Amino acid sequence: MSILLFGVSHRSAPVSVLEQLSLDRSDQIKIVDRVLQSPLVTEAMVLSTCNRVEVYAVVEAFHAGLSVIGQVLSEYSAMSIGDLTKYAYVRYSEAAVEHLFTVASGLDSAVVGEQQVLGQVRRAYAAAEANRTVGQVLHEVAQRALSVGKRVHSETAIDAAGVSVVSVALGIAGRTLGGLAGRIAVVIGAGAMGALSSSYLTQANVGRIHVLNRSLSRARRLAGKIGESGVPADVWTLNHLDEALADADLVVSCTGAVSPVVSLADVHHALAAMRRDETTRPLVICDLGMPRDVDPAVAKLPGVWVVDVEGVQREPSARASAADVDAARRIVAAEVATYLTRQRMAEVAPTVTALRQRAADVVEAELLRLDHRLPGLESAQREEVARTVRRVVDKLLHAPTVRIKQLASAPGGDSYTEALRELFELDQTAVDAVATAGELPVMVSGFSDTTRYGTSPAQSSSKYHAE
């Protein structure tokens, strides 16, 4: 069994495609449950953010597992398999591990180096663990990915500027407005992104923040925190959105709603009510939702500037320095190598244990024959013979078992494990019994190349769509 990743992200698809694949928490659970209905998939978890949807699964077979995941996502998104594969990428086994480590480190984010994705990976893993859809393999790789992400952020300056999708978007807004100090802001959505946006706005000394949210209790909690920072804040219902827009210089929307929250009519009414010069006082709307919170037609209105995720990606400030990125990538590469070495060594351990058990069985059988041939042998003599035989066997096996662990830890080392089983006629069933008994953990290793849908792992290129 190996890890299979099927994903679509901002690097492979436009926002319109990501919108079709956007998943809320209940959707993620349903998709994982559907995927796990296949007997060929034993573990699964979904990482869904505003920039990506990725399904990680432990599969018995590459093509069959890929077909299962692709079909489930196709049905959910109402996209044909053909359309979906235009934008999807696939990683298999070692490449899937490397990708998750890279994502957790912020190296694959729209804003390179941002830390929010580390929390998103943590929540995806925690949700899968709570629903008992991860086992030993995904548990190990997810835990390691979180550790790698922390190490990258602590040992490099990749996030020294504290950049995030929110900070970059509001930086663009600040330039457009000639500064944020004293401006009237509207924050739509009181979740994690809304709280992060509010924090940035208070640090920028905006004049007031109107908080709008479906749940008024959450909106009041967020407004209370904003007020504690010294910036006036109040709570509005979504029914009064057009009034809030009419009072605003800046809007940040990040609700996670399945359809636009800010309509063309809402903005039309707000512009009519404002009666202000569009050149001296434009309205800037930061649409950070996925799917989009703002009707795309709003961007065509005079005097309105819409900043979305695609605009954030194009912003120079969204890019970390080359030196920091290189340092982070070196850490990821080293961590991947360490993980895979441990994984391969763990994989050979059941075979080594089975070999030693086979040798012990042979020794015991021969000692039993000795008892039958020399029934008068004194117990002290028998014990000395037994110790001598066991010492000889241990010494004969020591060098080969140490060496096989070393050889098996290198790429392609599984061939040495197979050779050991062949040489000593070790039954695979016996080896599997050792692994499942819990005496030694079994990690999964496999192909090191990335994989293209519809080809074998050994023949594959990196993905459906070049990133």
From Swiss-Prot:
One of its GO terms (molecular function) is NADP binding. PROSITE patterns: GLUTR. The keyword Nucleus does not apply. The keyword Ligase does not apply. Residues 447-467 have a biased composition (Polar residues). Pathway: Porphyrin-containing compound metabolism; protoporphyrin-IX biosynthesis; 5-aminolevulinate from L-glutamyl-tRNA(Glu): step 1/2. The record marks H99 as: Important for activity. Its EC number is 1.2.1.70. It is an enzyme of class 1 (oxidoreductase). One of its GO terms (biological process) is protoporphyrinogen IX biosynthetic process from glutamate. Disulfide bonds: none annotated. It comes from the Bacteria. NADP(+) binds at G189, A190, G191, A192, M193, G194. The active site is at C50. During catalysis, the active site Cys acts as a nucleophile attacking the alpha-carbonyl group of tRNA-bound glutamate with the formation of a thioester intermediate between enzyme and glutamate, and the concomitant release of tRNA(Glu). The thioester intermediate is finally reduced by direct hydride transfer from NADPH, to form the product GSA. Homodimer. Catalyzes the NADPH-dependent reduction of glutamyl-tRNA(Glu) to glutamate 1-semialdehyde (GSA). Possesses an unusual extended V-shaped dimeric structure with each monomer consisting of three distinct domains arranged along a curved 'spinal' alpha-helix. The N-terminal catalytic domain specifically recognizes the glutamate moiety of the substrate. The second domain is the NADPH-binding domain, and the third C-terminal domain is responsible for dimerization. HAMAP family: Glu_tRNA_reductase. This is Glutamyl-tRNA reductase. It comes from Mycobacterium leprae (strain TN). The gene is hemA.
